[in-house]
Amino acid sequence: MKQEFSTSWISSTQPRKQRKFIANAPLHTKHRFLSTNLSKELRQKYGKRNLPLRKGDEALIMRGTFRGKKAKVVSVDLRNSRVAIEGMQRTKKDGSKVNVFFRPFALQIQTLNLDDKQRVAALNRKQSENKEKK
């Protein structure tokens, strides 16, 4: 694999090349790596198993010390592939509070932010495709 990111590169069995692909990917491609499982209700409704996280989505934390808590996504860090969730904060030694960032695999989307018309259109398109298959 070349030094820069290449869209024509398919895959490799070597973990170092897989890590390099993810690290060198442009931000619009890294957004796809932030996919998170949907809740059972959303899965049935839209016929999709997972979607990329967005600011405004409500997520349930499935792993770690904050397990079981549900809140809105405050920010999405594409460079580090991390997500900050409302109210999930740690207190630093000086007393200031800092957001705790989560990896997307530790979350589950409970409600979607449907402000974006393109996102709604994509969901409806997938929904109609699944109905045609059945």
Give the positions of each predicted feature.
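Structured, basic alpha/beta domains of bacterial-type, RNA-associated proteins
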Residues: 70-127
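Intrinsically disordered, Lys/Arg-rich N-terminal extensions and targeting peptides
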Residues: 1-53, 126-134
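Short, charged beta-turn/beta-strand-edge "cap" motif at the junction between a beta-strand
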Residues: 62-69
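Generic, well-ordered alpha-helical segments
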Residues: 51-53, 65, 77
